[in-house]
Swiss-Prot record:
It is found in: Nucleus. Residues 11-103, 151-246 bind DNA. The gene is REM5. Residues 287-299 have a biased composition (Polar residues). This is B3 domain-containing protein REM5.
Length: 352
């Protein structure tokens, strides 16, 4: 089965980085505001919604700034300096909001425990019935202006090592056509070593990488509690999941993790320190954050901004090169036509 190609989403959207002082307001880009909002909608209220919460957040719009109500949305979604937020306009001043972490992956939120108890586990084995699978919280569509959404983060647990089975966020799998049936894939580490594997989907909607996971972790000395990021390489024949980040050598051993967690009420979410071992939780804690260092957040922000600047410069450079090549081809055609016309003119003079 061929993977769907990336394409620009139909819904107009914009993204903004989360910078210091972000809790008081966030700006709508002037160009987006002029094109999609100004003079087209009455009132000064926008509505924000995110996938893990069924609640709609009312936020006041003053000019092209979101102000009153924005702080509550920020705190409910645990947004931090270094994150990016993508606003997708669904019409009638309703925006679906996606949080992107400094690693350029979608931020994952743990579902409420009541949700875990209600969701059935089929075809995965009896041992997985007590396993808490953390689902992807937001659904976004990548485009040329968005962060890289071809990656997702995962944690190593005793359970997924033993079963040689590791989860993939549902929306990620759906985006690339991996959410139905089975698909052959290849796991690749940073050294280029590969392991044959496959993606399996189940009636419950869960999607897993089956096979090769334990071998990859062993070869790369990944241990329980470590986290890693996979990037999907769009191979036309067999999808390749490449390991593109892993814990640095010498890092502090097993710091406490902080998840972004949805409260059981289904409304706001609360931050808390997860002090249990990951294998006791029974599932991966994706895109979790160390509870320390504002300086670390600032470094991640600088790295993320550098990546975007580099990508933008590369695109501009490629665009300039393409334009120059087109000009050269056009000039060559003009020269050819000029020579042909001169030859024709000379031939006409000779006949006269």
């Amino acid at each position: 089965m061929k993977n769907p190609t990336l394409f620009a989403p139909k819904s107009p959207h914009f993204f903004q980085p989360i910078l210091p002082g972000f809790k008081s307001h966030i700006k709508i880009p002037v160009k987006f505001f002029s094109k999609h909002i100004e003079g087209k909608h009455e009132g000064n209220t926008v509505y924000l919604r995110s996938y893990p919460s069924r609640r709609t957040w009312k936020v006041k719009m003053e000019g092209h700034k979101l102000t009153e109500g924005w702080k509550e949305f920020v705190e409910a979604h645990d947004l931090r300096v270094g994150d990016f937020v993508v606003f997708k306009h669904k019409g009638d001043m309703l925006f679906h909001v996606t949080a992107i972490g400094p690693s350029c992956c979608e931020v994952q939120y743990a579902p409420s425990r009541s949700h875990d108890r209600n969701e059935e586990s089929d075809e995965i084995g009896e041992s997985s019935r007590n396993e808490k699978i953390i689902e992807e919280n937001v659904k976004t569509e990548p485009d040329q202006f968005s962060p890289d959404l071809t990656c997702f983060s995962q944690s190593v647990t005793a359970s997924n090592l033993t079963r040689d089975l590791v989860g993939i966020p549902r929306d990620f799998a759906k985006r690339y056509g991996l959410n139905i049936g089975r698909h052959e894939i290849v796991l690749m580490d940073e050294e280029g070593n590969t392991w044959e594997s496959e993606v399996k989907s189940y009636k419950s909607g869960r999607v897993f990488i089956a096979g090769g996971w334990t071998s990859l972790c062993t070869a790369n000395k990944l241990e329980v509690g470590d986290s890693c990021t996979f990037k999907l390489l769009r191979n036309p024949k067999i999808p390749v999941f490449r390991l593109c980040s892993r814990p640095k050598a010498g890092a502090e051993a097993r710091p406490h993790k902080r998840s972004r967690v949805q409260s059981s009420s289904g409304g706001s979410r609360q931050k808390h320190d997860v002090r249990q071992k990951l294998d006791e939780e029974g599932g991966p804690s994706r895109c979790t954050r160390s509870s320390n260092k504002a300086t670390g957040d600032q470094e991640k922000l600088q790295q993320t901004q550098s990546c975007f600047i580099f990508d933008h410069v590369a695109k501009v450079k490629q665009s300039v090169e393409d334009t120059l090549n087109s000009i050269r081809r056009f000039r060559a055609k003009l020269e050819t036509k000029e020579h042909n016309l001169e030859a024709l003119l000379q031939e006409t003079k000779t006949k006269l």
